[in-house]
C-alpha cells in the first residue's frame, strides 16, 4: 500500500508539474500576444505622430511664408508712411507760407474756380486752399512728390 501511495502521490506531482507547465505556457503565450499588441499600437502611434509632424511642418512653412509676406508689406507701408508724413509736412509748410504771404500782402478774399467769371468772393483762402484759386497766391517753393 505504501507503494501505491507513492505511485498515487507521484502521479499527483506529475499532474501538478504538467498543469504548471501548461499554465506557464499559457502565460507566456498571453505575454507574447500582449507584447505583440503593444508593439503594433506603438507602431501605429509612431506613424500617426509622424503624419502629424508632417502636417504641422507644412503649416509652419505656410505660416512662415505668410509672415515674410506680411513683414515685407509692413516695411513697404512704413516706408510709405514716412514718405506721406514728409509730404503732408511739406504741404503744411506750403500752406503756412502761403497764408503768411497772404497776410503780409493784405490779400485774403479769393474767388471760387466755378464762380471766377462771376467774381463771387468766397472768403479767406486759408479755409480751403485746395478748392480756391487766388490771383495773389504764388508758390514760394517747388515741392516734388
UniProtKB/Swiss-Prot annotation:
Expressed in both shoots, including young leaves, stipulae and trichomes (except in cotyledons and hypocotyl), and roots, including vascular tissues (e.g. in both the phloem and the xylem). Present in seeds and pollen. Restricted to vasculatures and roots in the presence of sucrose or glucose. It is found in: Nucleus. Residues 1-11 have a biased composition (Polar residues). Residues 46-53 are annotated as: Leucine-zipper. SMART domains: BRLZ (SM00338). Induction: Reversibly repressed by glucose and mannose. Slowly induced by Pseudomonas syringae. Induced in roots upon cold and salt stress but then repressed in leaves. Promoted by low energy stress and dark-induced starvation. GO terms for cellular component: nucleus. Residues 16-37 are annotated as: Basic motif. Residues 14-77 form the bZIP domain. The keyword DNA-binding applies. The keyword DNA-binding applies. Keywords: Activator, DNA-binding, Nucleus, Transcription, Transcription regulation. One of its GO terms (biological process) is cellular response to glucose stimulus. Its main location: nucleus. GO terms for molecular function: DNA-binding transcription factor activity; protein heterodimerization activity; sequence-specific DNA binding; transcription cis-regulatory region binding. It holds the Pfam family bZIP_2. Transcription factor that binds to the C-box-like motif (5'-TGCTGACGTCA-3') and G-box-like motif (5'-CCACGTGGCC-3'), ABRE elements, of gene promoters involved in sugar signaling. Activated by low energy stress both at transcriptional and post-transcriptional mechanisms. Promotes dark-induced senescence and participates in the transcriptional reprogramming of amino acid metabolism during the dark-induced starvation response. Transcription activator of the mannan synthase CSLA9. Recognizes and binds to DNA-specific sequence of CSLA9 promoter. Interacts with ZFP7, BZIP4, BZIP9, BZIP10, BZIP11, BZIP25, BZIP42, BZIP44, BZIP53, BZIP58 and BZIP63. This is Basic leucine zipper 1. The gene is BZIP1.
Amino acid at each position: 500500500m505504501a507503494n501505491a501511495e507513492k505511485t498515487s502521490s507521484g502521479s499527483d506531482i506529475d499532474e501538478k508539474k504538467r498543469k504548471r507547465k501548461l499554465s506557464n505556457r499559457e502565460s507566456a503565450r498571453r505575454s507574447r500576444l500582449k507584447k505583440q499588441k503593444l508593439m503594433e499600437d506603438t507602431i501605429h502611434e509612431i506613424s500617426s505622430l509622424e503624419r502629424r509632424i508632417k502636417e504641422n511642418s507644412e503649416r509652419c512653412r505656410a505660416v512662415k511664408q505668410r509672415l515674410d509676406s506680411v513683414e515685407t508689406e509692413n516695411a513697404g507701408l512704413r516706408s510709405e508712411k514716412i514718405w506721406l508724413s514728409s509730404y503732408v509736412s511739406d504741404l503744411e509748410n506750403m500752406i503756412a507760407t502761403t497764408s503768411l504771404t497772404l497776410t503780409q500782402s493784405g490779400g485774403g478774399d479769393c474767388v471760387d474756380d466755378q464762380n471766377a467769371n462771376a467774381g463771387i468772393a468766397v472768403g479767406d483762402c486759408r479755409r480751403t486752399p485746395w478748392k480756391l484759386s487766388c490771383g495773389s497766391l504764388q508758390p514760394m517753393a517747388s515741392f516734388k512728390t
